[in-house]
């Protein structure tokens, strides 16, 4: 995606099972442990080396991106936190993250702004986007700051405190020649929302809105849209004996973002919220996940999503800056929800209509190995501008699995977002049931019986031999659009660019009991897909400051302990 000063947005980037057997911490293959360097923050927001027992909180950051693909951030606030003094703890949480991760955040910001804004200065950000940011942030702060009519209101305020603390922490720690403005740091939080904010601004500035809405996209445009904006593959899998329940997520994104991945464990012992500890995959400088992949040990829930791109541009009329963007709502839903249905209800409040996803929520509290699935174990919600639909899909999951692949499930959402219209025009590539990934999941998931099987399917790309790929490396559970190639038909399947699968994360009932996931960072590597390298052909196409040069990492265990 490029955002240029004329504000014409061009979204093309050149760019047999035993549950007791999963004990990854005992397997050298997954070992990542090195002693961390602790820092503590006091009530004056002074950061000192060491883990000080009477501090506001403490944490560490291990920048191991070049080692295994992931930074590891641990931030924990002190148990002395009360409802009356909660705001300072949320602010301190953000401050410590900004302080500890500033160097990786700087690298990510330079790549982010260069690739998305064509420049790294605040003046390079298009004026309409700056205006949207300011209107949205002013609305949020004026509506919710110092308002405590509900726990929800308080948590919106706490997200504001956390972000402002993050900005202060970054600015305090960063070198004088690597400073970022608060506006720039706020724009990093838009990583998920940005494309739909851009779509809304395009719609608003269209001279003839009727013509803009009614213009029919070509198959080439649709395929390019899916390639550069279609984000992620997801899978929830119950084994045939009901002995284990897996949930997994493979992020699709711009390749440069793979260089700044951080797994974060954030513990804020707020007595007013159930979700006070969260382990999630994220990026430097981003307070939420953006993938998304959240594990919430305190409520025993895991949440993932895949994106449903907006094909019906008339929906952008329902986007408004007077709303809560995804990055705020995701944090609040994680904190306030104790059940999957509660999560859907909390997430959809003040819906911005940006980052329209299919969200999947597994409530492991309701899961007992080798027993039938209980109602409300698994919910989904699909959001779009101006609306949403949600439902308990446990009965469907009980049949074996729930796959997710950037197509809306609910017929009403499918129709409203424009998919039914374009399916009639262009056929199976748009279809929920017959698109390549849908057929791959349907064919291959019955063979997945173990953690190894989950790893294999979520990084799968056999485009040279898989008939459902048709010779195209983008038609895979883990796409590799950089490789090129494709079938003779349709001729428009020719997109080549720096986009595709950039990671995979998996957890399960037994892993969640240990606060564990496994993860791999980098563009998928298979017999058909060699390791991606920032060679001379690609290095000038996409900024990637400080990124690993070659992505050929292994799976690792993610725990991020307090030891």
Curated annotation (Swiss-Prot):
First-level EC class: hydrolase
Pfam families named among the record's database cross-references: Phospholip_B
An individual GO BP term: phosphatidylethanolamine catabolic process
Keywords, in A-Z order: Glycoprotein, Hydrolase, Lipid degradation, Lipid metabolism, Secreted, Signal
Glycosylation sites: 85, 107, 118, 121, 208, 312, 537
Lineage top rank: taxon: Eukaryota
Compartment(s): Secreted
Sample GO molecular function, one term: phospholipase activity
Keyword Transmembrane helix: no
Keyword S-adenosyl-L-methionine (UniProt): no
Transmembrane segments: none
GO cellular component terms, semicolon-separated: extracellular region
Principal location class: secreted
Protein task: Probable phospholipase.
The protein's name in its UniProt record: Phospholipase B-like protein F
Gene that encodes it: plbF
């Amino acid at each position: 995606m490029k955002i240029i000063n004329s504000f014409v947005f061009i979204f093309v980037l050149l760019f047999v099972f035993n549950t007791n057997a999963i004990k990854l911490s005992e397997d050298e293959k997954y070992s990542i442990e090195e002693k961390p360097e602790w820092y503590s923050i006091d009530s004056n927001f002074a950061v000192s080396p060491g883990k000080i027992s009477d501090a506001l909180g403490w944490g560490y950051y291990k920048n191991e991106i070049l080692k295994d693909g992931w930074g590891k951030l641990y931030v924990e606030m002190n148990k002395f936190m009360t409802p009356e003094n909660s705001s300072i703890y949320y602010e301190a949480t953000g401050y410590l993250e900004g302080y500890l991760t500033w160097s990786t955040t700087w690298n990510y910001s330079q790549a982010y702004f260069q690739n998305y804004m064509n420049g790294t200065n605040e003046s390079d950000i298009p004026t309409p986007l700056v205006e949207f940011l300011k209107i949205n942030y002013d609305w949020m702060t004026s509506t919710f700051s110092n308002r405590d009519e509900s726990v929800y209101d308080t948590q919106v305020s706490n997200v504001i405190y956390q972000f402002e603390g993050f900005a202060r922490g970054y600015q305090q720690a960063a070198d004088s020649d690597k400073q970022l403005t608060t506006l720039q740091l706020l724009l990093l939080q838009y990583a998920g929302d940005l494309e739909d904010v851009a779509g809304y601004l395009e719609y608003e500035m269209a001279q003839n809105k009727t013509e803009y809405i009614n213009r029919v996209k070509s198959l080439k445009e649709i395929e390019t849209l899916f390639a550069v904006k279609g984000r992620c593959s997801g899978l929830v899998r119950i084994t045939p004996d009901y002995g284990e329940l897996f949930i997994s997520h493979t992020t699709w994104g711009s390749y440069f973002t793979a260089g700044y991945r951080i797994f974060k464990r954030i513990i804020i012992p707020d007595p007013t919220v159930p979700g006070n500890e969260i382990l999630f995959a994220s990026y430097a400088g981003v307070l939420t996940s953006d993938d998304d992949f959240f594990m919430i040990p305190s409520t025993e829930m895991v949440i993932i999503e895949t994106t449903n791109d907006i094909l019906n541009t008339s929906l952008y009329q329902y986007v408004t800056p007077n709303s809560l963007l995804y990055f705020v709502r995701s944090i609040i839903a994680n904190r306030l929800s104790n059940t999957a249905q509660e999560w859907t209800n909390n997430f959809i409040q003040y819906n911005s209509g940006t980052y329209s996803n299919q969200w999947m929520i597994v409530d492991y509290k309701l899961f007992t190995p080798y027993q039938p699935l209980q109602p409300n174990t698994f919910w989904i919600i699909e959001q779009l501008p101006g609306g949403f639909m949600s439902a308990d899909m446990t009965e469907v999951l009980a049949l074996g699995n729930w796959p997710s692949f950037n197509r809306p499930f609910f017929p009403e959402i499918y129709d409203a977002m424009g998919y039914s219209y374009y399916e009639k025009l262009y056929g199976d590539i748009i279809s929920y049931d017959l698109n390549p990934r849908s057929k791959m999941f349907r064919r291959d998931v019955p063979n997945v019986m173990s953690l190894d099987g989950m790893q294999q399917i979520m990084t799968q790309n056999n485009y040279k031999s898989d008939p459902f790929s048709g010779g195209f490396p983008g038609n895979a559970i883990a796409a590799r659009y950089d490789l090129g190639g494709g079938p003779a038909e349709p001729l428009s399947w020719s997109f080549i660019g720096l986009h595709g699968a950039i990671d995979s994360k998996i957890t399960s009932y037994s892993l969640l009991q240990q606060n564990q996931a496994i993860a791999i960072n980098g563009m998928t590597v298979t017999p058909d897909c060699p390791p991606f390298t920032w060679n001379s052909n690609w290095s000038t196409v996409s900024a990637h400051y400080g990124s690993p040069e070659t992505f050929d990492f292994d799976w690792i265990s993610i725990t991020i302990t307090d030891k």
